[in-house]
Amino acid sequence: FIDFASGLPTIEHIHEVAPEGTKVIYSDIDPVTVAYAQEIIGDNENVKYVQCDAAKPEGVLDSGIVEEMFGNNRKVAIGFNGISWFLTSDEVNHAMSVLYNWSGDDSKLFISEGDNPETPEKAEKLRQFYENVGQPIFYKPMEEFAALIQPWNIAEPGMKKLEEWLEMSTEVSETIEKDWQGVGAIYGGFLAK
């Protein structure tokens, strides 16, 4: 398993919930996060944490760590969760192409994407919030996003709102709709090679 923009591997991260012996490579762009994560992981031989910009996944793929962990096996699961709206369209397309060309047949990739907010005012408010914290966001309509992730194929059940895809309760879905009404939905799904 290769995961991008992993954050800190605290509770129920991939290496804790995957079958025993699963090899996991986490990555993040932030060197402080990487340093703390390496301390958390400790000497677990099945888990590595490296610095990498998700917009340039070749940073992990060409580092030697993948061959060390997986050998020649390129049938992998890839996590690209909560990243794409922080990348330009060109960066998303580049990352998806690199990962597709590198991965073996039957590989899977989990991805999520935020749809455009319903009104220009709400879009600007959300954009300004992220700009103020130093992390610009780039809205992509779902039709454009579908083109950017090619040649990956969207697997069943397709890109769905996360609260539907994760089968959250109706109460949770209603709360999300109420609290986030008009700021756009977050969709998630699996891509298959």
Residue ranges and their predicted role:
Residues V76-F80, A95-N116:
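Conserved beta-strand signature within the Rossmann-like core of class I S-adenosyl-L-methionine
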Residues T119-V133:
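Short, glycine-/aromatic-enriched active-site segment of Class I SAM-dependent methyltransferases
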Residues P136-M159:
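Short alpha-helix
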Residues F70-S84:
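Short SAM/SAH-binding signature in class I
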Residues P57-D62, F86-L99:
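A short, conserved alpha-helix within the catalytic core of class I
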Residues W165-K193:
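Core SAM-dependent methyltransferase catalytic element
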Residues A55, I83-F86, G114-E118:
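Short "lid" loop at the C-terminus of a central beta-strand within the Rossmann-like core
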Residues F1-A55:
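SAM cofactor-binding core of SAM-dependent methyltransferases
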